[in-house]
Swiss-Prot record:
Protein's UniProt name: Fructose-1,6-bisphosphatase class 1
Keyword list, A-Z: Carbohydrate metabolism, Cytoplasm, Hydrolase, Magnesium, Metal-binding
The organism of origin for this protein: Aliivibrio salmonicida (strain LFI1238)
Quaternary structure and interacting proteins, as annotated: Homotetramer.
Binding site for Mg(2+) 2: D115, D118, E280
Pathway it works in: Carbohydrate biosynthesis; gluconeogenesis
Disulfide pairings: none
Subcellular location: Cytoplasm
Cofactor note: Binds 2 magnesium ions per subunit.
GO molecular function, one term: magnesium ion binding
Top enzyme class: hydrolase
Catalytic activity reported: beta-D-fructose 1,6-bisphosphate + H2O = beta-D-fructose 6-phosphate + phosphate
Length: 336
């Protein structure tokens, strides 16, 4: 029987990658792990208790909040505040960043940005959902409350990023800039066990993930790329396969393992794109680049964008490097 390595053991073993590590980042990821277990438990009971459906409230983007959105947001926020390694959080479900005011939190080095439950509208139909997180070192003085500037940093300043996918099994996938590693939750032991070490996305793939129902509203370059994907060219392994779940974490996870591209372009309704730069695009971009892939807005590298507001949106193209380069060629050629 092969040796079982837990997430906690793996993080401790990797601390030597950080010359000035004091264990705080490891403990922070432990807080995320704890909240993930709690949220996973509720998701698994979703059909049995009154936790599914809309809450009746809207978030700052004007989107209907699901009951589990609020539940997950509260659990992750509490877990991060209670361990004292985080001075503040910004969440897709919060209008503004939240500064933790306990003295120990003010002395913390890190801020966390998160989408506590991506794809939550799929809960009612038992489709995979996820949590996305991003960790930065604060830039405001230690000992003071967190400021908005701590959160408005470009993605290339992230010290860690990851996601949890709640599906047929629950997995936590993360990077600290030294490879992408996946851990599968063993409910009988109550631990995340290393199952996918040093994950790499294939340079090419034959899967494209996009909501083609919005085709008429896409930029011309995206329309032309989709025609390219659908052409019958057996020598080039085309046509490609269309796979779109409607949950970013689930689509991204499949493409990471199998090779592919995820596209969420601008549309007439969302000229700046729909996905959030800070809560969704930056962490996924860090992960994909660490795995050998690529992420772009169609105009620039996602990780090089300097955000101007917490809920900023951008077009998003992410996946296998050759596929992202190909769609970029179409975007450049067919500029509207």
């Amino acid at each position: 029987m092969s040796e079982i390595r837990t997430l906690g053991e793996f993080i401790v073993a990797k601390q030597h990658d950080f010359p000035h590590a004091s264990g705080e980042l490891s403990s922070l990821i432990g807080s995320i792990k704890l909240a993930a277990k709690i949220v996973n438990r509720e998701i698994n009971k979703a059909g049995l208790v009154d936790i599914t459906g809309a809450s009746g409230d809207e978030n700052i983007q004007g989107e209907q909040q699901q009951k589990l959105d609020i539940y997950a947001n509260d659990k992750f926020k509490a877990a991060l505040e209670n361990r004292d390694q985080v001075c503040g959080v910004a969440s897709e479900e919060e209008d503004e960043a939240v500064a933790f005011n306990k003295e120990l939190n003010k002395n913390a080095k890190y801020v966390v940005l998160m989408d506590p439950l991506d794809g939550s509208s799929n809960i009612d139909v038992n489709v995979s959902v996820g949590t996305i997180f991003s960790i930065y070192r604060r830039i405001s003085p230690i000992g003071s409350p967190a400021t908005e500037e701590d959160f408005l940093q470009p993605g290339n300043k992230q010290v860690a990023a990851g996601y949890i996918i709640y599906g047929s099994s629950t997995m936590l996938v993360y990077t600290t800039g030294n490879g992408v590693h996946g851990f599968t939750y063993d409910p009988s032991l109550g631990v995340f066990c290393l199952s996918h070490e040093d994950m790499k996305i294939p340079q090419d793939g034959n899967i494209y993930s996009i909501n083609e129902g919005n085709y008429i509203r896409f930029p011309e370059g995206v329309k032309q790329y989709l025609k390219y994907c659908q052409e019958i060219k057996p020598a080039e392994n085309r046509p490609y396969t269309s796979r779109y779940i409607g949950s970013l974490v689930a689509d991204f996870h499949r493409n990471l393992l199998k090779g592919g591209i995820y596209l969420y372009p601008s549309t007439q309704a969302y000229p700046n794109g729909k996905l959030r730069l800070l809560y969704e695009c930056n962490p996924m971009a860090m992960l994909i680049e660490e795995a050998g892939g690529k992420a772009t807005s169609g105009e620039e590298r996602i990780l090089d964008i300097t955000p101007t507001e917490l809920h900023q949106r951008v077009p998003f193209f992410v996946g296998s490097i050759n596929m992202v380069d190909k769609v970029q060629n179409f975007l450049d050629e067919w500029q509207d």
